[in-house]
Each structure stands twice: as structure tokens, then as C-alpha cells.
Amino acid sequence: MPTTITNSKRSKSVVRITGNTSTTITMNQLSTNTTTELVSSAEISHVTSSTDGKWTIYRGNDASGEKVLCLFGENEIPLSQFDVTIAGANTTANLYITNSGTDGTLILTLNKTATYTIDPETGFPIV
């Protein structure tokens, strides 16, 4: 099923997933350019979802990873308004996301930590 990731350099990433799915989001997928931006970790700062089943988010490459969030029905969780994020014990692990229902949409806003390639002549990050 469709997965769309919108990345902003030095800012957040927004992940949109639809339908009955099992998908892995890697840290590299959260980068605007893996040559100049190396994403090392990500935390969930906002969640919007709907499903006729259950959305489950794990840290890792499959369902054996740490379960960090389960969502039923319709949800709007603006964690960033309360200076809270959901990360799990290993913020550097990939996100594995499943939907047990036949339909639904999940939109995640992710705060990310990254390092940037520096221009050796100017000392400024390469854009």
C-alpha cells in the first residue's frame, strides 16, 4: 500500500501510510539527501490516524521489535504541544508499522536528529 514521506532538511519528516500494510521506515528514508544529511534517530511528535483495525508501531525491522504505540479507530495526538515525543528505548532503530484493518490512514510527524556534511573550505554545512 502507498507510503509517502515528506522530508524537510534540519526539520521534521512527515510519513503518510494508507491501507492494510506492514512497512518499514528506515532512518535513511527520513533524509532529504543521504550525502549531506545523515539521520541518526527519530521520535514521533504528532499522530493522526484512522482504521477499522489497529495501527501498531514498533522500533526495529519487524514485529519482534519494541512496541511503542497502538492505535484503534480515529486519533489526533498532538504530542509536540506538550513537549512530549514517543521514541522507545532505541531511537536509532527503524520504524516498523502495521495495520490489521482493511483500510485506514496513518500520518506521523517525526522529529529527527541528524549530522550534516560540512564544506571544508567554508566550514558551513553543504546545502
Which residues does each predicted region cover?
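Transition segment at domain starts
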Residues: 1-38
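C-terminal interaction-tip segments
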Residues: 1-10, 99-127
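Hydrophobic beta-strand residues in large extracellular and virion-surface proteins
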Residues: 15-17, 44-47, 55-57, 95-97, ...
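Beta-rich globular "head" domains
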Residues: 28-55
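Short, surface-exposed beta-strand/strand-loop-strand elements in extracellular ectodomains
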Residues: 52-71
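Long, compositionally biased regulatory regions of eukaryotic proteins
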Residues: 62-64, 82-87, 109-112
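Short, solvent-exposed S/T- and G/P-enriched segments that are highly enriched in secreted/extracellular
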Residues: 67-83
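Noncatalytic modules at the cell exterior or secretory-pathway interfaces
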Residues: 83-105
